[in-house]
C-alpha cells in the first residue's frame, strides 16, 4: 500500500487574533508544523497547539520563520546565514520545551514561508537551517521542497533525514519550485484540481507545471494549508480520496 504523510501549518494565532482552523483540521492530518512566535504564534498558542496535537496522536514539528509578524513571514529578508541559524535554533528550541513539558517528542522542522522558499534555492540558507537542527537535535527530520538540491545537500552534510515535500494547493514552475504568491496563479482554488494534482504526485510521481510541462516529484509528505476559507472541507475531501485510493496516511518514521 502507498503511504504518504499529510502535514499542516498550525498554531498561527497570536494573542486575540485567531488564524486557521486548527481544531477542525487535526483529525485529517498525520503531522503538524507549529509556528514558534516569529512570523505567528505566541507561547500560549504554542502550548495549546502541542497539547491538542498529542491528543490526536499526530507528529509535531517546529515551523520557524522570519521575525516578520506583519508580513506573516512571507516576505524575503536580507539576512546572513548566521542570522538564519540563530533564528531557527531559537525557535525550534522554544517549541521543544513545550513538547517536552507535555510529555511528547518533537519529530521534525519545517521552515516557513519566505525562509522555506529562500532555502530551497539558496545553499547557504539551507545549510544554516540544517546546522541549527543538527546542533539542537540531529534526530529531527527536515521537511523541504521536493527535488531542492539546496535542501538535499544540506541534509546530507549534517546527516539529518530530509522529508521531501509537495503542496496540494500550490502551482509549480518548470524548475520544480513553487509559483510565487505574488502571482495570480500561485494557488489552486478548485478542490478537484488540487486533488487531481496530489494524486498525480503520490501515485505517478509528477506534477504539471503552470506551462504544462511534466515535472518529476517524489514526495514523502503533502502540505495542506489550514487557513483557507474551505480548508477543513478540502482536508476532509483529500483524506477520503486517499482512503478510496487505498493510500495510507502516516507520519514519516
Swiss-Prot record:
Pfam families: LamB_YcsF. It catalyses: 5-oxo-L-proline + ATP + 2 H2O = L-glutamate + ADP + phosphate + H(+). Its EC number is 3.5.2.9. It is an enzyme of class 3 (hydrolase). InterPro entries: Glyco_hydro/deAcase_b/a-brl, LamB/YcsF/PxpA-like. Belongs to the LamB/PxpA family. Forms a complex composed of PxpA, PxpB and PxpC. GO terms for molecular function: 5-oxoprolinase (ATP-hydrolyzing) activity; ATP binding. It comes from Bacillus anthracis (strain CDC 684 / NRRL 3495). GO terms for biological process: carbohydrate metabolic process. Keywords: ATP-binding, Hydrolase, Nucleotide-binding. PANTHER family: 5-OXOPROLINASE SUBUNIT A, UNCHARACTERIZED PROTEIN YBGL-RELATED. Catalyzes the cleavage of 5-oxoproline to form L-glutamate coupled to the hydrolysis of ATP to ADP and inorganic phosphate. This is 5-oxoprolinase subunit A. It comes from the Bacteria.
